[in-house]
């Protein structure tokens, strides 16, 4: 296998080899996540959750938003980080409502070759986009599914060079 293929296989099948996932950090307290949900406001996705400090010490939590896109014509990561937000310092027993907002177009993938019928375009493929919030990629809580009923071009670009004439 080529090095790129080996790396893909390692990331897919050796998840336990990652010692410190993104968002890992030392905390002297614990947090619980509840009421995880999402809503649409025009073309804006809003993921929300209540964070409660259930530990004995004050602390802050960084909430991360992830999206799992549908399988489609374009190759995509299995899950992608789309945003994050830090709570204020929460005293033991204190709760904070957190919202992470991002445009729907941020779910789009780039179609370089025209696999979706749209060459050089950012495309939101038809299907179900699973939405999650959590403290790391290993601790995620489902917020719902955004359903795209059709494939949509969010931005059409123009190619500036022909690959056959590209020179180094």
Mark where each language-model region is.
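Intrinsically disordered, low-complexity Pro/Gly/Ser/Thr-rich segments with frequent PxxP/GP/PP motifs
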Residues: 73-117
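Short, electropositive, low-hydrophobicity segments enriched in small/polar residues
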Residues: 59, 97, 138
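Beta-sandwich strand segments
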Residues: 137-145
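Short acidic, flexible loop segments centered on an aromatic residue
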Residues: 56-73, 79-81
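Secreted, periplasmic, or luminal enzymes acting at the cell surface/secretory milieu
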Residues: 1-60, 66, 92, 121-134, ...
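Sparse recognition of residues in long alpha-helices and their boundaries
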Residues: 64-65, 109, 145
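Beta-strand elements of well-folded, non-transmembrane domains
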Residues: 53-55, 69-71, 104-106, 135-137
């Amino acid at each position: 296998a080529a090095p790129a293929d080996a790396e893909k296989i390692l990331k897919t099948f050796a998840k336990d080899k990652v010692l410190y996932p993104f968002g890992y950090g030392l905390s002297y307290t614990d947090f619980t996540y509840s009421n995880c949900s999402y809503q649409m406001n025009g073309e804006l996705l809003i993921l929300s959750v209540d964070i409660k400090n259930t530990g004995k010490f004050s602390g802050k939590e960084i909430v991360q938003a992830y999206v799992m896109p549908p399988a489609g014509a374009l190759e995509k990561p299995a899950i992608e980080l789309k945003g994050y937000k830090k709570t204020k310092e929460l005293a033991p027993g204190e709760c904070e409502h957190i919202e992470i907002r991002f445009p729907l177009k941020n779910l789009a993938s780039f179609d370089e070759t025209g696999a979706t019928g749209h060459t050089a375009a950012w495309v939101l493929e038809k299907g179900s986009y699973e939405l999650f919030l959590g403290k790391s990629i290993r601790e995620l809580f489902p917020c719902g599914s955004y359903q795209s009923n059709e494939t949509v071009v969010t931005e059409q670009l123009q190619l500036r060079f022909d690959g056959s004439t590209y020179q180094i």
